[in-house]
């Protein structure tokens, strides 16, 4: 099979694929997968079957393959389920119309998306979950469907900043290199030791872990747990039960929030309260949104 050109000005080329390559095999199943799912959109990419495959479709297929160690059958099943889930949740319909769901004051200040420059010089998107900003446990976590929609909305915004539909950088094969199209997550637990016994929080945490593992493969580079009290150790045991050993290796636990910046990246991209020299999370998020608005205009 010939090399694949990206639909970009740089005319990037995906490494040549043989007919028996896992990507070629998964691509050949796309017609069936798309037909059965009744949906073809994911993370800003419209999956299409062609020979050779489109560059953006390969980005998506490669993520699903890497998540299951190149098992084509498992990747095809997982992709089909995710596409059906996205259709049921109406995620891409809202994205097409550029509609944003309003979750109300119960979720204000709980989640942010920013960009940092890593210690190795590359840019990285970061999602922030500020659990200390929860005003009322039942109001925020009691309606599980609403909480999950909020969490998915935060994830979808972060993924949009990865620009998977227009990237010109391919993803290496499984065990052949690092996927450059991933993000970091920061979970801030300062002041939330009281969450341990709340059943709404436990249910929301468990459901979120399962949903993310099933529908957002290979999007996590690093996951920071900051200011975690010992009483909440149950959460980390729960997380490790629902993710792969490879994913668990990405977890970093930081006791003191001021130490986060040194682990995360360039100080200017991290708020001062977390050891950086940057603006507040809200200001950094608005800055990123402004940059993307200029780029896409």
From Swiss-Prot:
Topology versus the membrane: Peripheral membrane protein
Gene3D superfamilies: CRAL-TRIO lipid binding domain
Localization in the cell: Cytoplasm; Endoplasmic reticulum membrane; Microsome membrane
GO biological process terms held by the UniProt record: Golgi to plasma membrane protein transport; regulation of exocytosis
PROSITE patterns: CRAL_TRIO (PS50191)
CRAL-TRIO domain segment(s): 106-282
This protein's UniProt keywords: Cytoplasm, Endoplasmic reticulum, Heme, Iron, Lipid transport, Membrane, Metal-binding, Microsome, Transport
Reaction(s) catalysed (UniProt annotation): a 1,2-diacyl-sn-glycero-3-phospho-(1D-myo-inositol)(in) = a 1,2-diacyl-sn-glycero-3-phospho-(1D-myo-inositol)(out)
Pfam families: CRAL_TRIO
Xref: InterPro entries: CRAL-TRIO_dom, CRAL-TRIO_dom_sf, CRAL/TRIO_N_dom_sf, Sfh5
Chain positions recorded as heme binding sites: 131, 151, 187, 189, 223
Main location: cytoplasm
Any one GO molecular function term: metal ion binding
Any one annotated GO CC term: plasma membrane
Cofactor: heme b
Family the UniProt entry places it in: Belongs to the SFH5 family.
Function: Non-classical phosphatidylinositol (PtdIns) transfer protein (PITP), which exhibits PtdIns-binding/transfer activity in the absence of detectable PtdCho-binding/transfer activity. Regulates PtdIns(4,5)P2 homeostasis at the plasma membrane. Heme-binding protein that may play a role in organic oxidant-induced stress responses.
Record PANTHER family: PHOSPHATIDYLINOSITOL TRANSFER PROTEIN SFH5 (PTHR47669:SF1)
Protein's name according to its UniProt entry: Phosphatidylinositol transfer protein SFH5
Name of the gene encoding the protein in the UniProt record: SFH5
């Amino acid at each position: 099979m010939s090399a694949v050109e990206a639909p970009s000005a740089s005319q990037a080329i995906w490494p040549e694929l043989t007919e028996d390559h896992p990507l070629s095999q998964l691509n050949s199943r796309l017609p069936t997968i798309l037909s059965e799912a009744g949906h073809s959109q994911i993370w800003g990419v419209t999956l299409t079957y062609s020979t050779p495959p489109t560059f953006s479709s390969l980005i998506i297929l490669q993520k699903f393959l890497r998540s299951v160690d190149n098992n084509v059958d498992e990747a095809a099943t997982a992709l089909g389920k995710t596409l059906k889930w996205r259709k049921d949740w109406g995620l891409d319909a809202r994205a097409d119309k550029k509609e944003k769901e309003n979750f109300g004051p119960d979720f204000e200040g709980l989640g942010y998306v920013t960009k940092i420059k890593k210690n190795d010089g590359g840019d990285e998107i970061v999602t922030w979950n500020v659990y200390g900003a929860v005003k009322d446990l039942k109001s925020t976590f009691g309606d599980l469907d609403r909480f999950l929609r909020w969490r998915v909305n935060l994830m979808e915004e972060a993924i949009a900043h990865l620009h998977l539909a227009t990237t010109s950088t391919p993803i290496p094969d499984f065990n052949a290199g690092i996927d450059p199209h991933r993000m970091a997550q920061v979970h801030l637990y300062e002041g939330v030791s009281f969450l341990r016994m709340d059943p709404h929080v436990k249910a929301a945490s468990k459901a979120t872990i399962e949903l993310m593992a099933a529908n957002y493969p290979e999007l996590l580079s690093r996951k920071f747990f900051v200011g975690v009290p010992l009483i909440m150790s149950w959460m980390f045991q729960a997380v490790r039960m629902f993710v792969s050993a490879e994913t668990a290796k990405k977890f970093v636990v930081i006791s003191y929030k001021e130490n986060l910046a040194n682990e995360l990246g360039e100080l200017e991209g991290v708020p001062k309260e977390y050891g950086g020299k940057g603006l507040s999370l809200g200001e950094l998020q608005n800055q990123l949104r402004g940059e993307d608005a200029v780029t896409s205009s």
